[in-house]
Amino acid sequence: MAEAVLNSVAKQLVEMTLNKTKYDEWDLQWYTESPFWRRSNMYFSREYKTIPDYELGNIKHGMTLDNIKVTSENLIDFLKIYKNEVNIDEMQRANYLLDHLQHLNLRTRYLMGEKFSFDEMTDGLYCLVAPEYDYRKFDSIIEELKQALPGKGTIQERIEEFKHKIMVPRENLLGVLTNTTQYFHDVTMKKMHVTGNSMPRVRVRELTDKDSVFLSILFGYDYNHLEYERNFNLLYPWTVDKVMEYIGHEMEPGHLTYFEKRLQSMINTCWPEMSIVSLFSSSNAFSEGSSRHAYNMCFDNSMSKQVEFEKEYIFEPAGLDLDLVELMELWHKYCEIAGYGKMETSRNIWDGKWTIEEGSQFLEKYGFCSKGDGEKEAASYKDDIGHYVAHDYSRDTIREYFNSYSHDIDKQWELYEKLCSSHMSMREIKDKTFRPYEMVY
């Protein structure tokens, strides 16, 4: 009885999420409408993105934002009472559906004009509230860079110069991306129960939007296979750290592996909620954070092993200066701290504590954006929906959770695979109490 009731709630959650995309077009990150799908025509573009990877058509019409708000509120009230009747083995699913209905409701209210503080928003969308970062770390990392980075001029100029020196030349980009993709695919195959049929085709091209990183085309899927093409932008500045991020976390063992495991879970269980991943949800916060930790696991959570990989797979084939390899560990540390700098800028602008000009000055002071770009980037944070909370803070929250579970790398891989198919809870991951049911019984 409980499964039928929860299936009914989940079906309505999916329908409302699909309908909301009419008003919130970038929300739906992944959708599998059936156990299998094949693209039946060639009406797609390699010039602009479609989110999700194919047109939803009429299924995104039928409900207004007010309809979604009222219906989600009614389902939230119902689930809060109904939870008292479910069995222990259905509690995680009930909690998951309740969380995601609350995410949907808050995002809908925001689209209708309701105002929230930054922390209220990230709590409502991702079940995460990031504490204020230690601002002393911004000054500390700059001092480390001053001592280590080569070159002359201001530290901001030396940061820009270093980025340029670790940028993969466009003539070498396809080979570097292809071989890096193959490596991460092989590790994923070794560590997880995946079929091995889902490694994307890698292509490079100049995209219309020079700031766009890549463009994906989904040609089909079934239980054992995602048929994907990923076009990487030749106009994007492909530094070594960006190659690592956009291969390891965006593809395998990151997002694409997560999508594959959710698809398999949907087919195995017929749970409607496993067919979607909404950008504004704790599912996406888990995916963003865990995918970053998962690509670290490919190197046994060892930065020295990761840097050795970068030397062999990126520096050498790209013809980069090998003397710079020894600086990569410090550079990765800086990149992580930069994410928190952007998070704090976003929070302070959102909450009205900083002006755009103050945010711009902060970003440029620490080299978190190029000189002259601060105002444009800071202005974009007026409408930021907690991106860096769902990405950077989520990564560190999940990293701590995995390490609290076990430092054994094989056990962490086992945990990751289970979580990809589970009704995860970011709140319980935050307090380190969550265990997928398959690992409890």
How would you name each of these model-derived features?
Residues 1-441:
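N-terminal maturation segment of proteins
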